[in-house]
A protein has these predicted regions:
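Bacterial N-terminal signal peptides that target proteins for export
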Residues: 1-6
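Non-catalytic all-alpha helical scaffold/repeat segments
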Residues: 21-238
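Bacterial N-terminal signal peptides
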Residues: 7-15
Length: 238
């Protein structure tokens, strides 16, 4: 499988147990997620989401638990829906027969937190345990609005998922701001993930490189130098 330095996509693809041919086909399918922002279309996103749910990774997952890959995929879908709230009930009707048990659809709707999410939730056949737990599930906006000082790996994943779903530069800029703020901090693992994912995305997608180029111009000289040093350190380590 071609090396893909995306925290978001790697978390999904790495778990796929498949032959080489199947692996390539599934990777091609999953690779449509981080490029969705180039041609956003909520119906295309729904169709892609349904196809992804049919891959072995998710068809074999009857645990009800959210792996990192499943978490990221659902965040992406939730953010697509969040940016297209008028599609909520269409997605709800389509996915009711695709997501079994419907507890997963309840989680998706809670992540999205659109005005009609509650209407969809009322129609779902979900366990009492899940229904009681739904108020504890944060929306994708809660993840993306997290203060830079307290962000962790899940927040980085949510920011990437949100950018892939919308193309909104603010999500990428927040990752760059996190790198600057934590350059001398005590969370090297999250900092490393942020640097690695940003550098990789900049190399793969010119749109992201352009966003960072413009963002650097808004920074004071000292912070601009910190960001550049953090990104350069990856190149010298290779």
């Amino acid at each position: 499988m071609k090396k893909n330095a995306l925290v978001f996509l790697a978390c999904i693809v790495a778990a796929l147990p498949a032959s080489a041919a199947e692996d390539d086909a599934q990777e091609a399918l999953f690779a449509q997620v981080p490029t969705y922002f180039r041609q956003p279309d909520p119906q295309r996103a729904l169709d892609l989401f349904v196809q992804l749910l049919e891959t072995p990774l998710f068809k074999a997952d009857g645990s009800g638990q959210f792996s990192s890959g499943k978490f990221n995929l659902f965040l992406w879908a939730a953010q697509v829906l969040n940016h297209n709230p008028q599609e909520t009930m269409h997605w709800c009707e389509t996915l009711k027969s695709r997501l079994a048990p419907q507890d997963d659809l309840a989680t998706l709707m809670t992540f999205a937190a659109t005005p009609d999410s509650g209407k969809c939730l009322q129609q779902l056949d979900i366990s009492a345990k899940t229904r009681a737990f739904l108020p504890e599930i944060p929306s994708v906006k809660v993840f993306t609005d997290e203060n830079i000082a307290t962000m962790g790996a899940a927040h980085l994943d949510a920011l990437w998922a949100s950018f892939y779903a919308s193309g909104d530069a603010a999500y990428v800029e927040k990752i760059a701001a996190f790198i600057v703020a934590h350059a001398d901090g005590n969370d090297p693992l999250t900092l490393g993930a942020a640097r690695w994912s940003l550098d990789s995305n900049m190399r793969q997608y010119p749109e992201i490189a352009a966003i960072i180029g413009k963002y650097k111009e808004t920074l004071p000289a000292d912070k601009r130098a910190v960001l550049q040093k953090q990104l350069d350190s990856l190149n010298t380590a290779q």
